[in-house]
């Protein structure tokens, strides 16, 4: 989250915020070359992405095809948003026009985020969760978010299988991963 980034910067950062965010501002303004993977994800998620007018306009052409591989995707509004955050901090994002736009987009698309939710949001430090997986220490986010716990449970289940033998992206490996995730989410 923006609040998390700004809290980490305030507590641990050494660069001035505008200098820290300058590469992101420039990348959004100047654009980046669309990769095969990015194009694939847009095609894969097309049905849900097209339900949102903003996403539809930004990531799809008039024939509803995703932005082309090797084309340059510029995001001037994102650049301006990051510039405002660089100059005015948390308030630039969680109060005023940006917060109103996010809340309006959420509510008009069936979401639940309100302007009050935006203005009252705060980042919090939480104790991370950790496990070992095949000799590596894996550290991830702790509760209240559930994603970190599910990740660690999935890895702990998968450690019981020889994934090298079944092969990268093989039907067997994907089956093992699917079953492990299903049990971790249960």
PLM regions: where:
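Feature marks proteins synthesized as precursors that undergo proteolytic processing into two chains
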Residues: 1-186
